[in-house]
Regions:
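Substrate-binding/active-site clefts of carbohydrate-active enzymes
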Residues: 8-26, 30-31, 35-182
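Basic K/R-rich, polyanion-interacting modules in nucleoproteins and related proteins
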Residues: 1
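Active-site capping/gating regions of soluble enzymes
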Residues: 185-186
Length: 189
């Protein structure tokens, strides 16, 4: 049985988890959380997006933030705000420890991945990565006006999946999460 969970949401209000690790990878790996899932008969935990993501400017202008994580900017990095240490880079070790804890409990870890768009938005969005490297190789552009993005995702852009560059990026990312981070599977958004 697969249990879908949000890293922050699963433990943020859980009084059985120490306050300093609630809403983090360490909190998700806390023994009482894993025991609860085992009692339910869960065999795999599916984590909602955990790739590094950014906040949308329109949310920030309203005093809000991107809770769900569907605005990816780093396909090879676990989101650093989910690290209990607060140190950049420590999220990798904490994520790996969480995966090990689930494997020791006989459960698999599945990631909800978002490879159909990025946080760079439309032509007015920020230049954070692929726009600056090779815009036309990574994004679907409007045929008669290549300044604008062909948006099939409702986010301002869509990755160009038939591009060898985009396809290589995605397969390299998937391989990384399996070989280096030891996850067991994926759900594609």
């Amino acid at each position: 049985m697969i249990y879908e969970a949000h890293v922050r949401g699963m433990t943020n209000l859980n009084m059985d988890v120490p306050p300093d690790i609630r809403g983090t990878y360490a909190g998700l790996a806390y023994p009482s959380v894993i025991e609860y899932l085992k009692k339910l008969g869960v065999t795999a935990i599916e984590l909602m997006p955990i790739h590094q993501f950014v906040n949308d400017s329109f949310l920030q202008e309203k005093g809000l933030s991107n809770y769900w994580g569907y605005n990816t900017i780093g396909f090879f990095a676990p989101h650093n705000a989910y690290s209990s240490s607060g140190q950049r880079g420590e999220q990798v070790n904490e994520f790996k420890s969480m995966v090990k804890a689930y494997h020791r409990a006989g459960m698999e870890v599945i990631l909800d991945v978002v490879y159909n768009h990025t946080a760079e938005g439309n032509n007015r969005g920020p230049t954070l990565s692929f726009k600056g490297i090779d815009n036309g190789a990574y994004y679907r552009l409007v045929d008669n006006d290549r300044r604008h993005y062909f948006d099939t995702t409702g986010t301002g852009n869509s990755l160009l999946m038939r591009s060898p560059h985009a396809l290589q990026l995605i397969t390299d990312s998937l391989r990384y999460w399996v070989t280096e981070m030891h996850v067991d599977g994926f759900r594609f958004d």
